[in-house]
Design a protein with these regions (language model features):
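Actinobacteria-biased recognition of intrinsically disordered, low-complexity terminal regions
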Residues: 1-2, 293-298
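Bacterial N-terminal signal peptides that target proteins for export
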Residues: 1-10, 269
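Bacterial N-terminal signal peptides
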Residues: 9-20
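N-terminal zymogen propeptides
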Residues: 14-15, 24-28, 266, 278
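Solvent-exposed adhesion/ligand-recognition segments of exported proteins
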Residues: 23-255
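Glycine-centered small-residue hotspots that permit tight backbone geometry or close packing
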Residues: 123, 265-266, 282-283
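Extracellular Ser/Thr-rich, low-complexity/disordered mucin-like segments
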Residues: 248-275
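A cross-kingdom C-terminal cell-surface attachment/processing module
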Residues: 270-293
């Protein structure tokens, strides 16, 4: 066939080259839309309980529960909203963000693996059941990271989530199907969204991120929770702001809403790659048909 249709060889080679250089992140995840929940560092559904000198940098919200205890000795630097319209809206927006994260197309199945010792690039990582972090998880590269966890998330003592090579905590999301427990002295990053509860053991810190328990309790013990600061810029495009930490006057300003796309890098992205492939394949088919007819006529 190729002796009759030698013109196909460079077409096939060129098409393969296009596919080879297509950026993997052209189809990457988008940030879940936190909406007004972006204004909160901590949210819970039933109760918020604290022991020790915990510090929540920013706003604290609770809805529909009404029990917030342990402040003082704990400190909330922003505003505490308990079962009011602001907390209700933030919880509704959290539900939307949680669903967005849960429905993101999976890029890697990590079921049964420990996150410790892994070096991951932007993507959507799925655990069918529980997930554990023992040691250090390294997130490398600017973009969106979503962890879909079917049941529980547990970190061991002294576990670390670190970001390098442009990775930002504002682009990291943990969607947990039941409850999350951060072990003592854990250094965690990202927005932690648990369907049920979040427990932070003594000395565990979220050094850049949020703790958001949709339906259950947030339990603290001498912890620090600090939201991402500055403008969240993912890839070469701009993401939404991280929102203010709030103050005596009310919650901070919501950053730009909507999912934040991770733009493709390199030549074309999907917007140019797919039409180019269609043109090449279509042209090859037409030329093949024309030459076949010419051979038949001879």
């Amino acid at each position: 066939m190729f002796r009759r249709l030698p013109f196909l060889i460079p077409i096939v080679v060129f098409t393969g080259a296009l596919v080879a250089v297509a950026p993997l992140d052209a189809f990457a995840a988008t940030s879940p839309n936190l909406g007004t929940a972006l204004n909160f560092t901590a949210l819970a559904g039933s109760t918020v309980t604290n022991t020790g000198p915990s510090v929540i940098t920013g706003n604290l919200g609770l809805d529909p529960g009404s029990s917030v205890t342990g402040f003082p000795p704990g400190t909330v630097t922003g505003v505490t909203h308990i079962s009011d319209a602001v907390a209700l809206q933030a919880k509704n927006d959290l539900t939307t963000a949680y669903t967005d994260a849960a429905n993101a197309p999976v890029t890697t199945d990590m079921t049964g693996l420990d996150l410790g010792g892994k070096n991951l690039t932007p993507g959507v990582y799925k655990f069918d059941s529980s997930a554990q972090l023992t040691g250090t998880l390294t997130l490398s590269g600017n973009g969106v990271y979503i962890f879909q966890i079917g049941s529980t998330l547990t970190t061991a003592s002294n576990a670390v989530v670190q970001t390098i090579n442009g990775a930002q905590a504002c682009g990291v999301y943990w969607q947990v199907g039941s409850s999350a427990t951060l072990g003592s002295a854990t250094h965690f990053q990202g927005t932690l969204m648990a369907l049920t509860s979040i427990t932070m053991i003594t000395g565990a810190n979220i050094i850049s991120g949020r703790a958001m328990a949709r339906n259950g309790a947030l339990t603290l013990a001498s912890n620090h929770i600090v939201p991402p600061v500055g403008t969240c810029t993912l890839g070469s495009g701009g993401g939404g702001g991280n929102g203010g930490s709030g103050g005596a006057g009310g919650p901070g300003t919501v950053g730009t809403s909507g999912p934040v796309p991770v733009p493709a890098t390199g030549a074309g992205g999907p917007g140019l790659l797919v039409p180019a492939l269609m043109l090449i394949i279509g042209g090859a088919s037409i030329e093949a048909a024309r030459r076949s007819r010419a051979v038949a006529v001879r």
